[in-house]
UniProtKB/Swiss-Prot annotation:
UniProt lineage: Eukaryota, Amoebozoa, Evosea, Eumycetozoa, Dictyostelia
Membrane-spanning intervals of the chain: none
Chief location bin: mitochondrion
Keyword Membrane: no
Binding-site list for Mg(2+) 2: D223, D227
Protein name per Swiss-Prot or TrEMBL: Decaprenyl-diphosphate synthase
Role description: Supplies decaprenyl diphosphate, the precursor for the side chain of the isoprenoid quinones ubiquinone-10.
Record localization: Mitochondrion
Any single GO CC term annotated in Swiss-Prot or TrEMBL for this entry: polyprenyl diphosphate synthase complex
């Protein structure tokens, strides 16, 4: 009997201990989950407001934007990059850049100032920039037209027979956008950076400018088909002038001709850089098409880098490689291209809300119509959470687009987006200041200002 009582007592004690242990374990797990949620929320807040998180935690903005130091690693993808710590040099660079709080509750939002380290250098006019590379841009356009119409790149040793030349209709369609006056920002960046690093533009660097412009133009042709755009650069788009089928073939042809020119440079590192840029451009377009109404700044910045930033990043890296620069200068050039590329696309997304069709040379307010959530509406969601429902259904119901535009206008989304673009521009300028002083370097600073202050 005594043994039975003791056993029952022990049993009750054991049950109590087990029960308390389970309760404590459940409480501990809940606490851990709560802490993880708080950490994730803190990352998102710091991510969207550009606040620096605690030193012990990685800064998500920096992680996303510090890209391509491992460009030669073919398996390198953004998802892996997000788990890497910020290199020491980049942390030091962060200290030199003033990051204002863009998530204030005040009625007014402090405007981040553009860095102008050389006394109003940013106020110089754009024509000063293009005048320096005017002859190179002219030669570039001539070579592109020759490549398109004759089916052979300039200075190539390959000579096709007359029957192998480009079909006249394909040649005409492919030349369509090159005959118009575009911004030509990307080749200008390549040419100015080439001059800044080696005082002159080598033949291989001029070819690089041609490649970048052909890849970019091909992406515009394909974009117009995907977006069903009716205008481009103030004229009817190729897909509307001809057909979607011919437009797709035209874009494919431009990419093929760009690949031929790339092969004549005969530099495996440059080939890998530009091939990666082309692959990531497609990946970014695919990511946008399959967004499924994701409410995520992380997703937005990844797509922005892939669609726009990667081509500028890799073209700057390639220009540095072709100049014979050391690894430090190559990495500085890569950082410059990456940050300027992100700034450029963020401004494009901003102009979709603030610009006019006449100024931009293309339709505006199309992102919402296409169901795309870019920086202005993502920032506005912080103040108007009801926007999340609209984003998730990709603004597909009647009145969604108008309601989203109304709430963005009422929010600080426009100002925060402008601050974000300026922040990336400032980082690009900080990279340029690490290069030796030259007229071309200074003009790149001016160009960086133009990128974020433009109205089209």
């Amino acid at each position: 009997m005594s043994r039975l009582i003791i056993n029952k007592s022990n049993s009750r004690i054991c049950n109590t201990i087990v029960k308390n242990y389970l309760i404590q374990t459940k409480y501990t797990l809940q606490q851990q989950q709560h802490q993880q949620q708080q950490q994730q929320q803190q990352y998102v807040r710091s991510y969207c407001s550009l606040q620096q998180p605690k030193p012990s935690k990685p800064n998500m903005i920096e992680i996303v934007t510090h890209f391509f130091d491992k460009v030669k690693n073919k398996s390198f993808i953004i998802e892996n990059y997000l788990n890497n710590p910020i290199p020491e040099q980049q942390q030091q660079l962060n200290k030199n850049i003033k990051i204002n709080n863009t998530d204030k509750d005040n009625d007014t939002l402090e405007q981040i100032q553009l860095l102008d380290p050389l006394n109003n250098l940013g106020k110089r006019k754009g024509n000063e920039i293009f005048k320096v590379v005017e002859n190179d841009l002219s030669n570039m356009t001539h070579n592109i037209m020759k490549t398109i119409t004759d089916g052979v790149s300039a200075n190539s040793t390959y000579s096709p027979s007359p029957s192998k030349k480009t079909h006249p209709i394909l040649s005409s369609i492919s030349s369509y956008y090159f005959e118009l006056k575009g911004k030509r920002i990307r080749p200008t960046i390549v040419l100015l950076l080439s001059k800044a690093l080696s005082s002159t533009v080598h033949g291989s660097q001029l070819k690089l400018a041609e490649i970048v412009e052909m890849i970019h133009t091909a992406s515009l042709v394909h974009d117009d088909v995907i977006d069903e755009a009716s205008t481009r650069r103030d004229v009817i788009s190729i897909n509307h002038s001809y057909t979607n089928k011919l437009a797709i073939l035209c874009g494919d042809y431009l990419l093929a001709r760009a690949s031929v020119v790339l092969s004549t440079i005969r530099n495996p590192d440059v080939t890998e850089c530009m091939s990666t840029a082309l692959a990531e451009l497609v990946e970014g377009e695919f990511m946008q098409a399959k967004s499924n109404g994701v409410v995520s700044f992380d997703n937005y910045l990844q797509k922005t880098y892939l669609k726009t930033g990667s081509l500028i990043t890799n073209s700057c890296r390639s220009a540095a490689i072709l100049s014979g620069a050391d690894s430090n200068i190559i990495n500085i050039s890569t950082e410059f291209g990456k940050n300027l590329g992100l700034a450029f696309q963020i401004v494009d997304d901003l102009l979709d809300y603030t610009g006019s069709a006449e100024e931009c040379g293309k339709a505006t307010s199309v992102d919402l119509t296409l169901g795309l959530a870019t920086a202005p509406v993502l920032y506005a969601t912080q103040e108007f959470p009801q926007l999340e429902k609209l984003i998730k259904r990709k603004f597909s119901e009647i009145g969604d687009v108008e309601e989203a535009k109304r709430l963005v206008a009422l929010s600080k989304g426009i100002e925060k987006t402008r601050n974000l673009a300026i922040e990336y521009c400032n980082r690009a300028i900080q990279s340029l200041l690490k290069l030796p002083q030259s007229e071309s370097r200074d003009l790149l600073i001016t160009l960086s200002h133009i990128v974020v202050t433009r109205t089209k």
